[in-house]
Amino acid sequence: MIKTYDVVIAGGGVIGASIAYHLSRRKDLKIAMIDCKRPGNASRASAGGLWAIGESVGLGCGVIFFRMMSAERKREAQGSAVVVDSSTPHILPDSFFDFALQSNALYPGLHQELKEKHGMDFKFERTGLKYVIYDDEDRLYAEHIVANIPHLAHEVRWLDQAALRESEPSVSHDAKGALEFLCDHQVSPFRLTDAYTEGARQNGVDLFFNTNVTGVLRQGAKVLGVRTDNEGVFHSKTLINAAGAWAAELSVMATDLSIPVAPVKGQIVLTERMPKLLNGCLTTSDCYVAQKDNGEILIGSTTEDKGFDVTTTYPEIAGLVQAA
């Protein structure tokens, strides 16, 4: 069976679903989204943090992984005895800041649009993000952050111990204070993916779940479509690679070139529903904690270079719980 589309999107996570939804606003395009399982598998395991500043200045699991890998490579190059300074944050380029802040600014309007036009609520919450300070090393880390973002001084504020306790009564009394990022908020990651997907469906996008892309149709350097395991052939003018951890594999099929994308294992802890304990998202040098609108508390995240391994391991889970 051959199907013909203007655009085929390979991948139904939050990126693929977002692309599908935004393209579906154009009524002149015939669009298909293909996903190997139900959409949003990895997206559902994320914290849902819209941490435009936090992720850019060395907080959050992505940058934690970068620091971990940088330390490993430095030790490999210079010897296992080398000391890697953990008090200096890895500040991402200004272009990343700008991209993240502009993206964040779209969410209030997007939240309203998906609720009003498509009946989908992805639980956008203006929670802020607090980096909790326990010792001199934490404070030094926070001071490095502030020193590197003078253009965003209006988006951060220092909280002393009394202000932190007033803002977050459940935080340990050992905490000395916090650095708060005022524009960093959160959403429900699986609801966001579902909202994009349902909005795209209502706008006419054809959805193909539990469908694997097994090959790419090519004529020289030109991509003509994809082959799938159970839905036949899709001809398309444009193929969009939104395959997440499998993006490198799809890139080779389409271009003979691999892109530097690899899976990173992340373990999290999700509690049962609890009374409201947190007023905002918290992060430390060891973990981050976010309470969702339904009362569940998410504690994350390990960042492990273990490929597609999805098993849970007690030492890592215990470490997250202890850190929280």
Where in the sequence are the language-model features?
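Helical element adjacent to the flavin cofactor pocket in flavoenzyme catalytic cores
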Residues: A178-T238, W246-E249
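Active-site substrate-recognition segment that forms the wall
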Residues: S18-R25, A42, G48-E55, V63-T88, ...
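N-terminal Rossmann-like FAD-binding beta1-loop-alpha1 element of flavoenzymes
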Residues: Y5-A32
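Short beta-strand "acidic-cap" motif of Rossmann-like dinucleotide-binding folds
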Residues: K30-D35, W158
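Helix-loop-beta segment of a Rossmann-like dinucleotide-binding subdomain
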Residues: L92-P93, M120-I133, A142-N203, L224, ...
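General beta-strand structural signal in soluble alpha/beta enzymes
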Residues: R157-D160, F208-F209, N241
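Dinucleotide-binding Rossmann-like beta1-alpha1 core, especially the glycine-rich loop
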Residues: G49-A163
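Helix N-cap at the beta1-alpha1 junction of Rossmann-like dinucleotide-binding domains, i.e.
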Residues: R38-P39
